[in-house]
Amino acid sequence: MNYTVLVTGSAYGTQNASTAFLFCQSLIKMSHILNSVFFYCDGVLNANNFNKPSVDEFDLLSAWKQLNEKNKVKLYVCVSAASRRGVIEDEKISNTKIKNGNFASFFQSSGLLELAYSIKISDRIIQF
């Protein structure tokens, strides 16, 4: 089966994102196709490169990166939701006083059109 995962919970403070990550890993282990993971609402905070947990906590940002690199899973972030929550790409900060963005490079900024396309080609969409 083809899946799209929609993450609407932040990296820390709720279990939405960590549960979504574990679900994605299970899909891959069970030989399902994971088309993409789309981060929306507070889920865009998963793409904040400044997320640094303490040494005894699970590093969800690194886990998403490994999922992307090892399994070629596309990680889409809603650019509008991200900018409203202060997650900004380097290329988008030219008209601000900020020197560097905090958008992790292995995520891709996109709009809701990408989510709609992912839903269209998937058998299932699962929201966390």
From Swiss-Prot:
GO terms for molecular function: sulfur carrier activity; sulfurtransferase activity. Keywords: Cytoplasm, Transferase, tRNA processing. The active site is at 78 (cysteine persulfide intermediate). GO terms for biological process: tRNA wobble position uridine thiolation. The keyword Lyase does not apply. Its main location: cytoplasm. Its EC number is 2.8.1.-. It is found in: Cytoplasm. One of its GO terms (cellular component) is sulfurtransferase complex. The keyword Cytoplasm applies. InterPro entries: DsrEFH-like (IPR027396), Sulphur_relay_DsrE/F-like (IPR003787), Sulphur_relay_TusD/DsrE (IPR017463). Part of a sulfur-relay system required for 2-thiolation of 5-methylaminomethyl-2-thiouridine (mnm(5)s(2)U) at tRNA wobble positions. Accepts sulfur from TusA and transfers it in turn to TusE. Belongs to the DsrE/TusD family. Heterohexamer, formed by a dimer of trimers. The hexameric TusBCD complex contains 2 copies each of TusB, TusC and TusD. The TusBCD complex interacts with TusE. This is Sulfurtransferase TusD.
